[in-house]
Amino acid sequence: TAPATDYTGYLVDVYRTKENGTEVILGTIAVDVSSDWTRFPRYGFVATFDASKKMDGVIEKEMAFLNRCHINGVQFQDWHNKHHWPLGGTREHLDEVYKDIANREVYTEVVKKYISTQHSLGMKSMFYNLCFGALDDAVSDGVKEEWYIFKNTGRMDKDSHDLPSSWKSNIFLLNPANTEWQAYIAQRNDDVYANLDFDGYQIDQLGNRGDRYDYDGNKVNLPKGYASFIEAMKQKHPDKRLVMNAVSSYGASQIAGTGKVDFLYNEVWGDEAGFKDLHTIIKANDQYGNHALKTVFAAYMNYDKAGSSTGEFNTPGVLLTDAVIFALGGSHLELGDHMLCREYFPSTALQMNDVLKTAMIRYYDFMTAYQNLLRDKDTEAEISVSLNCTDAARNLSLNAWPPQKSAITVYAKNVNGRQVIHLLNFLNADNLSWRDLNGTMPEPRLVSDVPLKMNVSGKVNKIWVASPDFHA
């Protein structure tokens, strides 16, 4: 029986007792006792729904790994028929199979099986869609010309997201603040919810578009429109969850300010490429969300390597980025039916090797078990940490946040009456970007038995030490 205290993480030891009374630990696993998954979101994804997923055991095996990593919410990417008509078929008659935007086959039974399998494991299922997308046949489905946004005031050049010619269509953009469009897409979502047991809507946008205009020639305020759109979606389906992407932080304050999203989601790019930028985003989001909303990063690892070749993820780069994100109190959208390397979620250019898969289990055990120290409300602390030794031959240096190359970075905060000190190893780092674009980040140099001196306030009752590289 789980303890009664809500929103608490635990690390459980599985052990046996020897004849002499000593305990032998056989393994450890994290447990999250929380009544609402959005308090500590650990977000995953699925992105392929073709015939290969109908084979016995495929979906179950994929979801078993996500479950072992304590993933508690799953985003369904590129599952939909059309951006303006997401359901494959009609409310009254579902298509057995339909084509997604890239003309890949999507089987309705596969979508349904993913949802039911996730629900059986205690996960929530979120469907993905833009807030303002329509394909080139939208007029035949009832989308009106007056709802679009344009690149100029002459109604001649619709804003669009252009795609390869082999795909279904380019995506043409509508005004997210247009109330008729809101009512239209909310009804299409109602068709989805009536047929598929999704728990909510993962809303997407496309970042700063520059100056754009509505049908009447008025300049469009997209961030304000996003807030209006979120409000309309929540009003139509008050019991469904909402999350919206803030691409490069665009519209983040307006999204959070609605009070209608369940956590904050930032897709980060080259303009926010530094480890220090992740800290800036989390602190800004904490203010935008009135200290109540957690942050999930869609942060694509080894991006350039994935764009030019196939192979494996660079394990040290992935783990260093996760270590920083977790220390800062965030989580990382990266695990799904494969590991994420590009904004096109179905891309499988890079794969996890067995070492990285094992490390992911340890890291997610760590994030889950220690979620209260990592992700509960905190205040940054000015705790002085220094080397209590004169061994110059070890070539060690410590610095306070933000990170520096050739140093161990200290990030300290006060959480729940405890002082938490993170030691992040950048001793061998070849750059200070979380992206590890070409997969070149070296494994950190291992240092051990280093005496540290810490100046802390108050009486020290106990000191605990934990690391996902050793303990979880």
Where does each model-flagged region fall?
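Short, acidic/polar
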Residues: 51-68, 181-195, 247-255, 314-322
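Aromatic- and acidic-residue-enriched carbohydrate-binding clefts of CAZyme catalytic domains
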Residues: 80-111, 139-176, 207-224
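Active-site-adjacent "subsite" loops/lids of carbohydrate-active enzymes
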Residues: 35-56, 125-196
